[in-house]
Amino acid sequence: MNPERPKKPDMLLWEETLFKDRDIFELDHLPDQFLHRERQLDSLKFCIRPALQGGRPVNALCLGPPGTGKTTAIFKLFEEIEAHSTRIVPVHVNCQMDSTRYAVFYQLYKKIFEHAPPSSGISFKRVFEKVAQHSADEDKVLIVALDDINYLFPEKEVDHVLYSLLRAHETCPGARMGVIGIMSELA
């Protein structure tokens, strides 16, 4: 006496959902509205403002507890920069993945030239010169966000990276670069 039950559709094929937008759960989701960070975004915009007139931006450090929106704030800022300026080239570098001076400049090169530098036989000096010369020749200002900059602290790699970025104009007159460091507060 087992009356035949209606067969449920396979759960994986259901079109119904409780969520209006599943994309908000994706790790790379960037919200349309970024609430409660207006003061921090305004401070970052103030630092970037000189670059809009072709000057050097003011360097900044975003410091706060993990998961409070530091990286998202930078992505929102960079989104706005790319929408309103061709003079500024914003580059986000994840220092957990790119933790050497060469790796940081590799990412800059890739962003500027829209392809990676040759995979072998090219020195840091050559990559550095190409990036700095492009900044000078094309009248571009590079804004480099070093996310999780604390990963550059071992071996004092941070000294080499910052020195190369902030003193590029000495090697290549006219090169303009600014740095935004992003770091979680140390417990």
Language model segments and positions:
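Walker A/P-loop nucleotide-binding motif
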Residues: 55-76, 97
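Pre-Walker A adenine-sensing motif
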Residues: 42-53
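Intrinsic disorder
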Residues: 34-38, 56, 68, 95, ...
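Mid-core helix/loop region of P-loop NTP-binding domains shared across ATPases and GTPases
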Residues: 2-19, 26, 57, 74, ...
